[in-house]
């Protein structure tokens, strides 16, 4: 039996893609082993959203080549899709494939293994408006409790800092039938929570309108919830302007749809939002957040913020700090701006010094910690349903509640992958303490 090892960098969508490829290889008779163990094939699923992601992708590729000179090295994902010539130039890479036609990954790998080609087997495909969603199955052979199901691919937003539309192509969506089928497989495999994810999740179904199919993210969520036995459904990141009122109503009424929305802000300064080509200003974002909280009062709203975007002054950053406080985010993911070749922002004047970016990120992180503690404090005294995932020690278990907060309770590993009501009794560092109710 041939062995294959995977290494995944980047986002949840990449993780879902890797899980799908693992499933394809297992179905073809391969054994999946940890990346540090001997294998016939090493596959690196890459990331280019930041310079750090791209640099680490190169490091992992080089490590795979250096440590396993007789094995096949396969590179897939956003790096070969956006810079195939760079990946081709890495000595020792045998196969490259972008973000499309990964259903053929075993065929390509076996062709390379059979013939031990002296040149790279290159299958990076250009994506056009006619590119269809690649309905790969989901990998189900893990010991995890939550599964990520990719239901949407591609982005047409073209924010000025972002390379992802070039890496992931145009909008395309998984069919409702496929969503029901894949959620059914996950439920049968024992997963208690399914997280619906995409590159531009709020645009689910948008491109299908030209085929006469009028579906939205609301319909995708309803499809997932319609599967017998599904216990929890959670949404991945989506734009605030794409949150439908009926989706909020569903979240308020349907206990299985978790009370958590990740709404990327990126900046709290209107001047910077315009320069970023974001689809809202701070006034509209505030209105949307208020509407969400009016319909779902106990919702947790998390976000992404970029600091040090070209032209961001100290005054602009101070505006973002104050706006973040006003929004009361449960958690912020903070990113120093990373210049990406080929994007408009990379050519903008007034690039911000790296030291200034780091200093601003640290200041915003302090605000994030304050807001997170406020969110934790507001949960004390409540009863939450917790999906237990792993043991902290021999006497305590850790899990995730609806608002995407970590909860630790006295308990043993028998609680793993079960859902139980927990009375929240206190806070320790950045997580909640509780007792089984």
Pin down the residues of each PLM region:
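Proteins enriched for Cys/Gly/acidic motifs involved in redox and nucleic-acid/cofactor modification
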Residues: 1-204, 216, 246, 257, ...
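Short glycine-enriched, charge-decorated loop/helix-capping segments at active-site entrances
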Residues: 48-49, 168, 208-212, 274-280, ...
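Glycine-centered loop/turn positions within well-structured domains
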Residues: 103, 157, 169, 202, ...
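Hydrophobic, well-ordered secondary-structure elements that form the walls
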Residues: 263, 304, 324, 332, ...
